[in-house]
């Protein structure tokens, strides 16, 4: 694995977010959203990829990978830090993608340094005693980092019991003002459903869900939010409004009306985000913010999600804005080039 370690160290020095090792291909990395090669890197053989992966897996994980042909897990490499890993079979052999994780959870102030409005709204949401906050976006948009930043703020401000359910655990939270228990699906508990059901009996104040993936997880999250818990969950969606539809589509049609009522009652807000390249060479998040105002709650209850857009467009003073308004604000501040904003705006 020594070659892997050398490459991972080089990737971190160049600010890479992801590293790719694949049979029959040279190693690659993603820097500021762009895929690029390592200097003078040679093609990986099947044996090299297999040996490196084998060194990272526990005996239990090897059995899992042998049976399912793919696996998600997280590791900590001495002197290099933590990585989220996905390994899979492909037509040419093995592929391994490593996401570089920070040594400690990100600070909300850092993630929202260019966006005072998003910072204020997220802090307000974190101070709620109960309800549901959704972190939405496409893969690789940074929603897990924003969720972790909010958990860290809760952990550092006040005495609350936080239970996380993750697959895998990405950021490690040390109990500070309160108490944090992190559970990894497949390692500490069999499934999201089982972990969420158990969490309701473990006297939490805050329940953090890596992703709402199925009917039962959605139902349990809504139940938890309705019964006095603050629930922070992620979902994959194309915008904040689409998050509402995606969440409800996970529930069987016969139960959807009831779930819609629970969501309308318990929702605090939805933050949708995307990452853009900055003028200075890094990346910055653009945050779309949907607040569960009385008007928004009524539109959810009445199954009129598309009418929520007009409420967002006119609700800036109430802590709401669309992704297009967020993109324009970054361009106006000179943080992101206007041509870049135009390209991203077409995608949303």
PLM region spans:
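Short, flexible helix-loop junctions that flank or precede catalytic/ligand sites
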Residues: 1-348
């Amino acid at each position: 694995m020594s070659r892997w370690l050398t490459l991972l160290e080089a990737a971190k020095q160049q600010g890479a977010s992801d590293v790719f090792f694949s049979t029959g291909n040279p190693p690659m990395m993603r820097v500021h959203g762009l895929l690029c090669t390592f200097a003078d890197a040679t093609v990986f053989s099947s044996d090299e990829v297999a040996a490196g992966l084998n060194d990272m897996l526990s005996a239990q994980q090897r059995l899992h990978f042998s049976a399912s042909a793919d696996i998600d897990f997280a590791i900590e490499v001495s002197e290099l830090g933590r990585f989220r890993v996905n390994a899979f079979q492909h037509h040419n052999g093995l592929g391994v993608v490593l996401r570089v994780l920070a040594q400690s959870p990100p600070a909300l102030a850092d993630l929202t340094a260019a966006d005072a409005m998003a910072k204020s709204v997220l802090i307000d949401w974190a101070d709620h005693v109960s309800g549901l906050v959704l972190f939405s976006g496409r893969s690789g948009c940074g929603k897990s980092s924003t969720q972790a930043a909010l958990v860290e703020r809760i952990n550092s401000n006040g005495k609350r019991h936080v239970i996380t359910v993750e697959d895998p655990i990405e950021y490690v939270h040390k109990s500070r003002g309160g108490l944090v228990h992190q559970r990894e699906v497949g390692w500490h508990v069999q499934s999201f459903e089982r972990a969420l059901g158990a969490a309701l009996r473990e006297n939490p104040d805050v329940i953090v869900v890596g992703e709402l993936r199925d009917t039962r997880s959605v139902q349990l999250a809504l139940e938890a939010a309705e019964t006095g818990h603050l629930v922070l969950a992620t979902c994959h969606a194309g915008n904040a409004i689409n998050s509402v539809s995606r969440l409800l589509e996970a529930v069987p049609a016969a139960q959807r009306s009831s779930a819609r009522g629970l969501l309308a009652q318990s929702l605090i807000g939805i933050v949708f985000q995307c990452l853009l390249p900055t003028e200075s060479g890094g990346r910055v998040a653009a945050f779309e913010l949907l607040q569960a105002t009385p008007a928004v709650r009524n539109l959810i209850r009445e199954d009129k999600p598309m009418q929520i857009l007009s409420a967002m467009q006119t609700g800036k003073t109430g802590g709401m804005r669309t992704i297009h308004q967020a993109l324009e604000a970054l361009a106006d501040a000179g943080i992101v080039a206007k041509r870049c904003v135009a390209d991203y705006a077409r995608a949303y």
